[in-house]
From Swiss-Prot:
Binds to 23S rRNA. Forms part of two intersubunit bridges in the 70S ribosome. Part of the 50S ribosomal subunit. Forms a cluster with proteins L3 and L19. In the 70S ribosome, L14 and L19 interact and together make contacts with the 16S rRNA in bridges B5 and B8. It comes from Roseiflexus sp. (strain RS-1). PROSITE patterns: RIBOSOMAL_L14. The gene is rplN. GO terms for biological process: translation. Belongs to the universal ribosomal protein uL14 family. GO terms for cellular component: cytosolic large ribosomal subunit. Keywords: Ribonucleoprotein, Ribosomal protein, RNA-binding, rRNA-binding. SMART domains: Ribosomal_L14. Signal peptide: none annotated. GO terms for molecular function: large ribosomal subunit rRNA binding; structural constituent of ribosome. This is Large ribosomal subunit protein uL14. InterPro entries: Ribosomal_uL14, Ribosomal_uL14_bac-type, Ribosomal_uL14_CS, Ribosomal_uL14_sf.
Length: 122
């Protein structure tokens, strides 16, 4: 579960290392973000010479959450960290590589480019 002020690790090569969630998109009453939700975030830590700079406001999609969640088949899955991938206005990733596993739920949310770049889909 991701909410306002949650810090997430960035799982791509845009140059950002850590982002802070400003808002979970999807309506005025949405409090928590789950895997596949789009958030607005601020870059808190970045590498020099990257595509995004510290302080920049970006859109990102959540790809991993530390809080376990159930799937329709009855199984549960959780990850070691909260992570996101920075995306553009067209919902395509701004980076060219994805690091670490991503959740299968991204396929249902039509983030096929992230699925194809990811080394592992769980």
């Amino acid at each position: 579960m991701v909410q306002q002020e949650t810090r997430l690790r960035v799982a791509d090569n845009t140059g950002a290392k850590e982002i802070l969630c400003i808002r979970v998109l999807g309506g005025s009453r949405v409090r928590y973000g789950r895997v596949g939700d789009v958030i607005v975030a601020s870059v808190k830590e970045a590498t020099p010479g990257g595509a995004v700079k510290k302080g920049e406001v970006v859109r990102a999609v959540i790809v991993r959450t530390a809080k376990e969640y159930g799937r329709p088949d009855g199984s549960h899955i959780r990850f070691d960290d909260n992570a996101a991938v920075i995306i553009g206005k067209d919902n395509n990733p701004r980076g060219t590589r994805i690091f670490g596993p991503v959740a299968r739920e991204l396929r249902e949310r039509a983030f096929m480019k992230i699925i194809s770049l990811a080394p592992e889909v769980l």
